[in-house]
């Protein structure tokens, strides 16, 4: 029985970020800090920091944490360059003025250049926040889940 409990806890630890990003799991037994510490025990020490940063940004974007997005990393090793400030400003302005079509096109400009795993975390987080702001929460969550799946593979 304890072996099954251990396997269940491990499966929950692995699935938690996806469930949280999808809006399924909001008040379970894990939070970002607990998940991060458990994740650090299971994998290479450099990877959890990047995963935690990306997950923190995604959850902030989906849950309305605009101030958290301002703290986005400027670069990451082996990844994409930070997004263009002019495109980010245009995206934020379009979302603030509830221009859905323009917001969607700017998100495509930011994220449409490759796979979601290649995008800069700030571009992804700002895109999700803008989609949520114009009422496209379901689409934002779907992009967040797909991004987490791509990054975990």
Give, region by region, the residue ranges found by the protein language model.
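Alpha-helical solenoid repeat scaffolds
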Residues: 1-153
């Amino acid at each position: 029985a304890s072996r099954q409990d251990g396997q269940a806890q491990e499966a929950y630890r692995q699935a938690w970020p996806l469930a949280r990003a999808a809006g399924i799991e909001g008040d379970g037994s894990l939070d970002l800090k607990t998940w991060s510490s458990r994740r650090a025990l299971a994998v290479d020490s450099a990877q959890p920091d990047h995963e935690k940063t990306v997950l923190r940004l995604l959850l902030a974007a989906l849950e309305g944490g605009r101030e958290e997005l301002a703290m986005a990393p400027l670069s990451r090793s082996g990844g994409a360059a930070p997004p263009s400030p002019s495109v980010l400003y245009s995206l934020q302005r379009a979302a603030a003025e509830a221009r859905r079509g323009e917001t969607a096109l700017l998100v495509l400009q930011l994220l449409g250049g490759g796979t979601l795993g290649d995008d800069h975390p700030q571009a992804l987080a700002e895109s999700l926040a803008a989609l949520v702001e114009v009422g496209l929460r379901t689409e934002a969550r779907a992009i967040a889940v797909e991004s987490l799946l791509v990054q975990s593979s």
